[in-house]
C-alpha cells in the first residue's frame, strides 16, 4: 500500500514537472486587428503593465500590431474588466508567434517594451472652448499624465518627463489668430490676459518673446533625449516661431506694435525642426499662419474625399516609424484642424513622412530626430470630429473604441518604451 502511494506520488510529481515548463511559457496575446473589441483601452493595459516593471512584446505588423504579455490571472481579469479582447497561448503557440514575427519573409518583427515613459501635456491653466484629443484619449485609455505650462517649461520641470505633448498652441504669440472672429469673446480676452500676465511674470515684454523662449527650451528638451508629440497648430507654429526669432510677424492687435513688413525676407530656417522655405501670412485677420498648412486645399476636396494613407515601413529595418504607424487599417478618414497637414515640398530632407493624402503632396503625419530625442507632428484637431469648431461638444471616445486616428496618438505614447537595438545592415 505504501509502495502504491509512493508510485502515485512519483507519477504526479513527474507529471507536474513536465507540465510546469509549458505553463510558465503561457502568454496572453492582445490582437489588434479589426476584431479587437477596444483598440484604445488595449494601449492602457500595455502602459500599466510597463508601469509595474513588466515587459511587453509589441508584435509589429502581426495581426494589426498586437501586444503579447507574460500570463497572469491579474492581467486576464483586467482585460475582461476593460472589455479588451485577448487570447491565451501555450508554449507551442507562443513559439509559433515568435517564429512568424521573426520570419525574414514577413514584414513583421518583435519589439520589446521595457521602461514606461512618464508623460506630460503642455496645456494652459485657463479653460478654452475646444478639447485636446491627446488628453481625451489618455483619459479614456486610463494612462496617467501631468499638466504643465510655460513657467514649468522655463524652470526645468521637463527634466522629469520622457514624453511631452503640445496641442493647439500658437507659439507665434498671435493667440491662434482668432481676433477677426472672436476678438471680443470672453474666452479670447481671458486667454490674452493670462498669456500677457505670464510673460510679465517671467520677465518678457511680449507674449511672442515668451513663446520663443518656451520653444527653444522644448528644443533643448528634445536634444537631451525627450520625445515631443504635437498636433494641430502646435506643429507649424513651433517652427514659425523659431524662423521668425530675428524679426516681428505680430501686428499691433497682438503685441502693441506693427509687424515688420519685410519679415518674410528675414526668416531663418536653420533652427527649424521640420519645415523650411515657407512664407508667413502677415495679415492679422486671416485665420492662417503660413503656406505650410493645407487645410484650404482639403476643404475644397470635401469631407468624403478627405482621407490619408499610412506609409508602410520595414518592421525589421525601420522599427520607429513602423511602431508609430501600427494600425488595423491602412487608410484613415481625414479630420481638420487649424493646421491639418503640411506641404511636402516645405519639409526638411531629414523628416520622415508617415502618412499623406494619396495622389497629392499633402502630408498628415511626420517624424524626425534631433539630438538624442525625436519629434512627431500630426496634423488635425480631433480624429473623430471632422470639423471641430470652437464651442463644439466633447467627443465621447466610448463611441469610437476602434478609432484609427486616435490609435496613432497612442502609438506615440508607447514607442519610447522600446528597447533600443542595432539595426540590421
Residue ranges of model-derived segments:
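Cleavable N-terminal signal peptides
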Residues: 11-12, 22-23
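Helical hinge/lid and interdomain linker segments adjacent to catalytic or ligand-binding clefts
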Residues: 27-28, 33-37, 67-77, 127-235, ...
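Catalytic cores of eukaryotic secretory-pathway lumenal/extracellular enzymes that build
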Residues: 188, 203-204, 211, 243-246, ...
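Catalytic beta-strand/loop cores that center a nucleophilic Ser/Cys/Thr
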Residues: 132, 139, 236, 266-390
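Extracellular ligand-binding/catalytic regions of CAZymes and related secreted enzymes
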Residues: 25-31, 37-68, 347-352, 356-425
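Bacterial N-terminal signal peptides that target proteins for export
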Residues: 1-10
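Hydrophobic targeting/anchoring helices
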Residues: 24-132, 141, 380, 387, ...
